């Protein structure tokens, strides 16, 4: 089997180590309304279209109960849209600072292109958000061949439509000749739903939730334990392979191409 293309996620996978840009904004918009949410809660829906992310947070039982305690009713669609508008406003001001390619990404992408592979991408950000991120990432040396956002299709993750549109624009078929690489549960579901080889990257991921400094200075045993939790979570949600860093991707490609794996 010949792999012809790789579809990467953005924040937490190729840029923004740890996926911190949206995290603090989600926490802030709820805190402003007297509802405290944890980092873990804020990260759980990561990878979804951002308004869907806000909606998913309001549907978490603990958060919904806390909201009802504060306001006397459960969150409404009007509440969700109000928070999302505020989320967008804040996020736009900080996005340029969270578009730095993660170490190793540019080198791996260059190597993949030398092998003749095409590079696509999907995201949970809107097109307007990605106009900012993609422009800054390109200045810093990272530019995929194709970028598809939820605005470009009928629905974002976990639906496979962004991957299908990548396939069409890249001119690659069948889908099992492509790999989806991401750092969230929704990435794994997106890739599997699209019938692609699906790979979860652990270090720098939203699922791990550590800054580069925290990962480098953490006790190695503790870090390994946290990474194993993320690895299992990826596999439980459909990952065919997991890699610690992007540098492990080419080994995955070689494994797929040398053996007759069947996507199940």
Curated annotation (Swiss-Prot):
Which GO BP terms apply? DNA repair; organic phosphonate catabolic process
Residues of the active site are 9, 50
Q: Pfam families from the entry? A: HAD_2
**Catalysis performed (reactions):** phosphonoacetaldehyde + H2O = acetaldehyde + phosphate + H(+)
Signal sequence residues: none
Query: How is the cofactor bound, in the record's words?
Result: Binds 1 Mg(2+) ion per subunit.
Keyword list (alphabetical) reads: Hydrolase, Magnesium, Metal-binding, Schiff base
**UniProt-annotated binding residues for Mg(2+):** 9, 11, 183
Query: What domain of life does the native source organism fall in?
Result: Bacteria
Q: Name the cofactor(s) required for activity, per the record.
A: Mg(2+)
GO MF annotations in UniProt: magnesium ion binding; phosphoglycolate phosphatase activity; phosphonoacetaldehyde hydrolase activity
A GO CC term assigned to this protein in UniProt: cytosol
Q: What is its EC number?
A: 3.11.1.1
Q: What does this protein do?
A: Involved in phosphonate degradation.
Query: Which NCBIfam families does the record cross-reference, listed alphabetically?
Result: HAD-SF-IA-v1 (TIGR01549), phosphonatase (TIGR01422)
Return the similarity comment.
Belongs to the HAD-like hydrolase superfamily. PhnX family.
HAMAP family named in the record: PhnX
Q: How does it assemble?
A: Homodimer.
Q: What is this protein called?
A: Phosphonoacetaldehyde hydrolase
Q: Which organism is it from?
A: Bacillus cereus (strain AH187)
- The gene designation is phnX
């Amino acid at each position: 089997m010949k792999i012809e293309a790789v579809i990467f996620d953005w924040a937490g996978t190729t840029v923004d180590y740890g996926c911190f840009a949206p995290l603090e904004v989600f926490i802030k918009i709820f805190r402003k309304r007297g509802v405290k949410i944890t980092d873990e809660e804020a990260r759980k829906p990561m990878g979804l279209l951002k308004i869907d992310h806000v909606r998913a947070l309001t549907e978490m039982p603990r958060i919904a109960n806390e909201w009802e305690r504060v306001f006397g009713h459960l969150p409404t669609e009007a509440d969700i849209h109000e928070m999302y508008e505020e989320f967008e406003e804040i996020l736009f001001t900080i996005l340029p600072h969270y578009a730095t390619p993660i170490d190793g990404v540019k080198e791996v992408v260059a190597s993949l292109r030398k092998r003749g592979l095409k590079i696509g991408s999907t995201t949970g950000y809107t097109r307007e958000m990605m106009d900012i991120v993609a422009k800054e990432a390109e200045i810093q040396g990272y530019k995929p061949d194709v970028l598809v956002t939820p605005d470009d299709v009928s629905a974002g993750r976990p639906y496979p439509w962004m991957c299908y549109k990548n396939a069409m624009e890249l001119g690659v078929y069948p889908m099992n000749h492509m790999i989806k690489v991401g750092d969230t549960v929704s990435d794994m579901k997106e890739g599997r739903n699209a019938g692609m080889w699906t790979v979860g990257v652990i270090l720098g991921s939203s699922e791990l939730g550590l800054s580069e400094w925290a990962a480098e200075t953490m006790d190695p045993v503790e870090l390994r334990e946290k990474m194993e939790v993320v690895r299992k979570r990826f596999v439980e949600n459909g990952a065919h392979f997991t890699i610690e860093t992007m540098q492990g991707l080419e080994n995955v490609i070689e494994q797929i191409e040398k053996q007759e794996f069947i996507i199940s």
